[in-house]
């Protein structure tokens, strides 16, 4: 009887060490895993035909990071012995469920441009919002003041229905700028620059 108990206890200890290792990898990796995983995963899942660029908004990276931290903490709570009553077990299960849900939602949160227009898949939303180039009323490039001078920070599109959407000016957006600027000029729209006061 005692040898069976020892084997079971050893298996549980091995399982806990395995979970502990996973949770530490998730916790430490939560700051760089989104940078490495999120965009390639989105490109594999949502590879739209003929896009000029596809990227996750910055909020998708933050949410994905938060989901990994929450999953790591939930796993640590699970093996720490805090899950002795039903409430604690339910809290841990909810933490794991919410972290997985946030991960899925952050992978589904992206925006891209192509020859037809601008496509946005919001964090809380079902399906893409489509804004054709004919729907664009105004385009503004917003500069901010930094130590070294002015830097273009956001590219904001104002649509005819009054809605606005801002892209952070990343290297990807900067490379696509000449292409979508031609589309805007075809519609008689000039990108204006706004400076801080």
Which stretches of residues belong to each language-model region?
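N-terminal membrane-targeting/pre-transmembrane regions
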Residues: 1-84
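Short charge-dense sequence patches
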Residues: 22-24, 80-92, 126-138, 180
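Internal/C-terminal transmembrane anchor helices
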Residues: 84-112
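Alpha-helical transmembrane signal-anchor/signal-peptide segments
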Residues: 108-126
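A generic structural signal for ordered secondary structure
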Residues: 116, 128, 187-189
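Non-transmembrane, membrane-adjacent beta-strand/coil modules in membrane-associated proteins
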Residues: 121-172
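A membrane-cytosol interface segment of integral membrane proteins
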Residues: 157-197
